[in-house]
Amino acid sequence: MSEVANSTSPVQDGADANGAQINTNVPAASGDAPTPTTAAQQAHQNSASLYVGELDPSVTEAMLFELFSSIGQVASIRVCRDAVTRRSLGYAYVNYNSSEDGEKALEELNYTVIKGKPCRIMWSQRDPALRKTGQGNVFIKNLDHAIDNKALHDTFAAFGNILSCKVAQDELGNSKGYGFVHYETAEAANNAIKHVNGMLLNEKKVFVGHHIPKKERMSKFEEMKANFTNIYVKNIDLDVTDEDFRELFEKHGDITSASIARDDQGKSRGFGFVNYIRHEAAAVAVDHLNDIEFKGQKLYVGRAQKKHEREEELRKQYEAARLEKQSKYQGVNLYIKNLNDDVDDEKLRDMFTPFGTITSAKVILRDEEKKDEEEKEVKEEKKEDEKKEDEEAKEGSSSEQNGEDTKAGDKVTIKGEKKILGKSKGFGFVCFSNPDEATKAVTEMNQKMIEGKPLYVALAQRKDVRKNQLEATIQARNQLRMQQQQQQQFGGIPQMFIAPGQQPMMYPPGARGQMPFPAGMPGAQGGRGAGFPGGMPGQQGGRGGPNAQQMPPMYMPPGMAPGAFPPGPYMNQQYMQLAQAAQQAMGGRGGRGGPMPGMPGMPQAQIAGGPGIRGGQGGFPQGGRGAPGGRGQPPMPGFPQGGRPGGPGVDMSVLSAAAPGQQKQMLGEALYPKIHEMQPELAGKITGMLLEMDNSELINLTADESALRAKVDEAMSVYDEYVKNKEGDGEKEAPKEESKEEKA
């Protein structure tokens, strides 16, 4: 909220809430200037913060400013929004510079219709303890649906100052028949309950009482459930009379009432209620009479429940059944799409039978047309057929065509009669008996060509899970797009693919077409003519060190931060080769030869065995791709080019269970080694470009070498065009610089 809103003091009581404030500023005895605390208190007295609720989600700050500025000078307005989606939460805060303006806005603008919804205005209460006390809060039920917030406020305003008034509404804005009135004092609430409870409002008798928090209501409700006296009986024979019904339950205790529900004609509806005096008698009746046969019917006898309690119990049962079903089919139900139109349930079952026992196989069909529409079309078509037959009879043509079958989409006409057949939607589901069979089917059948079309096979997911994943994917793409826009400000290089454990790459300003270097590698000591910032740990920059824009990137093994040294086999072979290559790359004309000093975690004997640093201009060419004659370092022998030991593969079961961000990382690890074989110099850039595609297409690229090569060639053409454009811009800028030098 704004500074004015933050400086607004909490409303302590009703007098302050309505702007009637007491001047507590006592003049200082000395002539000293007022302290900052005194000035802040004076500022608080001249400001007012209002809470504006029940707002439409489309209401903006500008709309509220236009409304509230008509009262007085507005200091600030803020519509509260969700931190992630930025959608309005339906309420806002309006801050005035004076409490008089706030009081005037509360009186004149309360319940003003904004975007078709009446707003609700009250003083902002910052202390949550005071907001949640509930003192003076009144609950009203059995309200007529014509009573709105304004009418309820006008009705109860006669008994005291109202802080807030609200009628509960559904999604469509219709009254739910109950509401709340929050008074400034408990005395006003008691006065309203005394005079209005049991009175008629719009010809309906209303109940008015103190609002009881839900927690207290639930505790009382549980106590009532434990000491019930009213029981519900169903499956009663229609011939049972009230006397027979009463005699059956009087055997177990004294009852106050026993009745069978009947319709308007007096016929039994098959259920009734019995109310006992004591809870013990009701409990005995439930235990002894439940599931017994009475007049040929097995009775159900149980505690009587209210409607909301039954609905809650049914909801819990449904949720439990849903969770049980979800756990039952977890990992065994497969989703298959890209099916041909002629594939039915039997063909789908035959496709997946070799992988295990199938409990169900279903191809989803399009919904059949409504019967009334079908009947109309059939009648119209019959009329058209009759006209055609009459014309053909007149022309003397044969009627052999009437018996032929003509197919048009999902409509089949046979001898003038039309039948609506469901057409395949192109996807279906197959459920196996155990997860191992399902995993095997996904591995073998995904991307397999069936009748010229590659199948997509994956574990089935619920709609809400897919929706959440889609939202996460969209959010990740938006973040990626923002990162790319930021990178374009520093040279516009496409995003690099970062292997596991590496830090993001940083592009120096003006380094067009060059490979980036890892940012923030600790330990580099800057010297005269120092090498790239963030160099190898402990390495000192020499006079002849290469500039930062020519330094090749340092690829670190997976799971290892830059500047650290790997354990195990990397220490002896692969990492030594990486260290030696870095030594050679950092050599300058004036650099010293010899081993690298002070590398932590490595014996000096191993370091000394490497070649000394020789002078030279190592680096990558600045024009785009690394030329064959360049001094860039080739891939290290013995170290996997994919950035991890062995060739990475894609496990479909693991991939489908991973988060969207992890799925992209796994697919990138699988594609990077293959792209590196085709284009070693630009493998990272190309992988980053391809990862913007959908996961289904990326999975296809991991299995189809020709498709991957085509995508790589396409990416290379885009990159070459980008480099040419950058070089053209540089050539255009060069003559201007030369002309400036000539003038100088």
Curated annotation (Swiss-Prot):
Protein name: Polyadenylate-binding protein, cytoplasmic and nuclear
Cellular component terms per the entry's GO annotation: cytoplasmic stress granule; cytosol; nucleus; ribonucleoprotein complex
Transmembrane segments: none
Pfam families: MLLE, RRM_1
Biased composition regions of type Gly residues, renumbered to the chain: 527-545, 609-632, 640-649
Family, as annotated: Belongs to the polyadenylate-binding protein type-1 family.
Purpose: Binds the poly(A) tail of mRNA. Appears to be an important mediator of the multiple roles of the poly(A) tail in mRNA biogenesis, stability and translation. In the nucleus, involved in both mRNA cleavage and polyadenylation. Is also required for efficient mRNA export to the cytoplasm. Acts in concert with a poly(A)-specific nuclease (PAN) to affect poly(A) tail shortening, which may occur concomitantly with either nucleocytoplasmic mRNA transport or translational initiation.
Sequence ranges of Low complexity compositional bias: 33-42
Segments for region (Disordered): 1-42, 368-411, 527-550, 607-651, 723-744
Sequence ranges assigned to domain RRM in this UniProt record: 48-126, 136-213, 229-306, 332-462
